[in-house]
Amino acid sequence: MDIQYLMRQAKKLEKAMADAKEKLAEIAVEAESGGGLVKVAMNGKCEITRLTVDPKAIDPNDKALLEDLVTAAVNAAVEKARTAADESMSKATGGIKIPGIAG
């Protein structure tokens, strides 16, 4: 096996992975909870880009409900972002599973 060839292929894979990681910020996912009372937008790096709370969800006497709605929406958005990031990184690596490279 040609070592030079393997080194070139490794460099190509490294560049493809770096490019894909940069593009994670461009991935956009949204999730909601409480029938749309709380909405979260997130990018592929699992950074929240927008959080919307319907005034109907704000009850000073039931703070726990709002906390639960926000938690549920954020967790759903994280799951969607991770899935999208994994798909993006899988394309960059040609389907090779490399632990810890997404996001």
Swiss-Prot record:
GO terms for molecular function: DNA binding. Its main location: cytoplasm. It comes from the Bacteria. Keywords: Cytoplasm, DNA-binding. InterPro entries: YbaB-like_sf (IPR036894), YbaB/EbfC (IPR004401). It is found in: Cytoplasm, Nucleoid. One of its GO terms (cellular component) is cytosol. Homodimer. Binds to DNA and alters its conformation. May be involved in regulation of gene expression, nucleoid organization and DNA protection. Belongs to the YbaB/EbfC family. This is Nucleoid-associated protein AnaeK_3694. It comes from Anaeromyxobacter sp. (strain K).
